[in-house]
Structures are given as C-alpha cells and as structure tokens.
Amino acid sequence: MPNVDDSVMGRQMPSSFDENHEFYNEKPMAKIFRKLREEPLIPLGAGLTVFAFTQAWRPMRRGDQVSANKMFRARVAAQGFTVLAMIAGSMYYNKDREATKELRKLKEERDSEEKRQKWIRELEIRDEEDKAMRARVMNRRAKAEEAKAGNASATPAEGGEAKSGVLNALGLSGSSSGWGKPGEAPLADASKAVDDEPIVSKVKTPTNVKRVSAEDDKTN
C-alpha cells in the first residue's frame, strides 16, 4: 500500500513553501490581503477608474462637456493601466501561481490519501473485531459440545451403577442367587427336578394297580 509521504509528498516542492502550514490553511480574507500586497497596481488602477468615472458624471449633470470628456479619457487611461498591471502581474507571478496550483493539488491529494488511510484502518479494526467475535463464538460452541458429550457419556454409567445397587439390595443379583437372564433359572431348576425323580415312581406297574384296587374294596 503506497504511503502518503511516498506518493503525495515525494515530489520536490518549492523551497519558499517548505514547512509553510499557514499557506496550506490560508483563510479567504488572508488570501485577498496577500494578493493585494503582491499586486498593488491592480487595485490602484481599479480605484483610479472608479474615481475618473465619478468625476465625469458630475460635469455631465452640470452640462460641462469639456470636463466630462477629460474625465472619460482619464477613466479609459486608468482602465488600460489596470489591464496592463494585471498582465504584468500575471507574467511576473506566473511561476508562483504554478507553484501555488501544484501545492493546492498536493494538498488535495494528501487529504484524500489521509481519508483513504483512515477508512482502511477502520475496516481493518472492524475485521479484527469480527474475527475475535467469531473466535469467541466458536470457543463457546466447542465448550458447550464438550460439556454435552461428557454429560451423555456419564449418564449410562450412573444408570448401570444404580441398577446393580438395587439388585444387590434385594439379593437378586446374578452372583448371589444364581439368577441370570429372566426365564433361564426356573427352566433349569425344573429340568433338574424331573431328572432327579426315580423312574419307577413315575411308571405305574400292574402290581401297583391291583394293590390300589384291593385297598379300595376294603374301604368300601
């Protein structure tokens, strides 16, 4: 990015205007008085022209044509003198006017460059603030996600511990009572009881049938 001193003030300026801050910030009235001091013949010629015109107007009212003509000639001479003074002053101060125009242009360029630099700095500051705000939002979001993941992983473990604690309190845990999955232990006990029962008692023989019949007859 070009610097103000390199791009705007890099060109050589006239030595008479070095460090001349009053010239850069000159007020309108100060400029008028400066022009009057630099070219005093122009206002002098303008004053003589006005004076000759007024002096010609009075003889005209009185009807003195000779005096009026003299004043008109004097007015024309004063006006010509003013024009010559303007031309001579323009030729004499041409270099200074060019320098003044150049300095005015440099001042405008410097002001515009300063405004652009301020605008760029403001944009950079806003960009940094935006980046910092986005970083804070991302950090908060990451912390919230980490906390949420930690709570989700801690909840199943706590549920398992609570369940095992209740089973131990009731004495129904798998290690103490031999219970495994629901429905497995009763089936195993029933099959074991059936296997332990004698086969003879389960089968009714003819002898047993006769014995039962005899006992029934006695009873009757």
Curated annotation (Swiss-Prot):
It is a multi-pass membrane protein. Residues 164-179 have a biased composition (Low complexity). GO terms for biological process: mitochondrial respirasome assembly. It comes from the Eukaryota. Residues 139-220 are annotated as: Disordered. Keywords: Coiled coil, Membrane, Mitochondrion, Transmembrane, Transmembrane helix. Residues 13-104 form the HIG1 domain. It is found in: Mitochondrion membrane. The chain crosses the membrane at residues 41-57, 76-93. GO terms for cellular component: mitochondrial membrane. Signal peptide: none annotated. Residues 91-145 form a coiled coil. PANTHER family: HIG1 DOMAIN FAMILY MEMBER 1A, HYPOXIA-INDUCBILE GENE 1 HIG1 -RELATED. Belongs to the RCF1 family. Associates with the respiratory chain complex III/complex IV supercomplex. Cytochrome c oxidase subunit which plays a role in assembly of respiratory supercomplexes. This is Respiratory supercomplex factor 1, mitochondrial.
